[in-house]
UniProtKB/Swiss-Prot annotation:
PROSITE patterns according to UniProt: SHSP
Protein name: Small heat shock protein hspG12
UniProt-listed SUPFAM superfamilies: HSP20-like chaperones
Biased amino acid composition, Acidic residues: 109-118
InterPro entries: A-crystallin/Hsp20_dom, HSP20-like_chaperone, HspG1-11-like
Keyword Metal-binding: no
Biased composition (Basic and acidic residues): 134-147
Disordered: annotated span: 99-147
Family to which the UniProt record says this protein belongs: Belongs to the small heat shock protein (HSP20) family.
Keyword tags: Stress response
Record carries keyword Cytoplasm: no
Coiled coil: none
Protein species of origin: Dictyostelium discoideum
Residue span(s) of domain sHSP: 35-205
Length: 205
């Protein structure tokens, strides 16, 4: 015979399962409606002092120009994109595509190198040029640098972080927002109002 505790336990489990499935459904619908896919969730520290609110977010390896901060409906949003380092790819491409100076100097023919006895028929010239081009291609393939990754742990892509300011928005002076980005750490400081209250007195006319 089931006791009252067993009945309450089953009801609680059913409610938890229902809430779980509803949250999964909401998450799926949000992913469908949102066009941007969030790849990175940066860590954040929020500290409230006597006179200010401090929000610190780690954004290592991200340029200041790729960070966007906004407040809409008491929701603070920090979003942007962490891009791959293109300088390394450009260096690799330049080193692999550009021939060395020694090779170019050897290939260039000067007037002093040729004599009348060195002139050959056209057929031999074409065969020699074909063989030289094949050798040059082999040398180019050997000189091309290959890149092999042994460890790949860094993540790139879009990032976004929300902070709900509803609970203490009445304390903050939004006109005093100050931002600082140094050594990969974004610091947002919002001063508190000198006189604030969460209650509003309404007079009767």
């Amino acid at each position: 015979m089931a006791t009252i505790f067993d009945i309450l336990n089953t009801l609680n489990n059913n409610n938890n399962n229902k809430n779980y499935f509803e949250s999964c459904k909401r998450q799926r619908t949000n992913n469908k409606t949102n066009k941007t896919i969030i790849d990175i969730l940066p860590p954040m520290d929020v500290t409230m002092t006597n006179d200010k609110l401090i929000i610190e977010t780690e954004l290592a390896g991200i340029s200041k120009d790729d960070i966007e901060i906004s407040i809409n409906d008491s929701i603070l949003t920090i979003q942007g994109e962490k891009k791959k380092n293109l300088n390394k790819q450009l260096i690799i491409e330049k080193s692999s595509s550009s021939p060395s100076l020694l090779d170019t100097k050897e290939d260039e023919a000067s007037i002093e190198e040729f004599d009348e006895d060195d002139i050959k028929p056209k057929s031999t010239e074409t065969t020699s040029t074909l063989s030289n081009s094949k050798e040059n291609k082999k040398d180019e393939n050997k000189s091309k640098s290959t890149e092999k990754k042994f460890i790949s742990e860094r993540s790139f892509g879009n990032f976004k972080r929300y902070l709900d300011l509803t609970k203490f928005l009445y304390q903050l002076d939004l006109n005093s927002i100050n931002t600082q980005f140094e050594n990969g750490l974004l610091t947002i400081t919002i001063n508190k109002k000198l006189h604030y209250s969460n209650t509003i007195k309404i007079n009767i006319n």
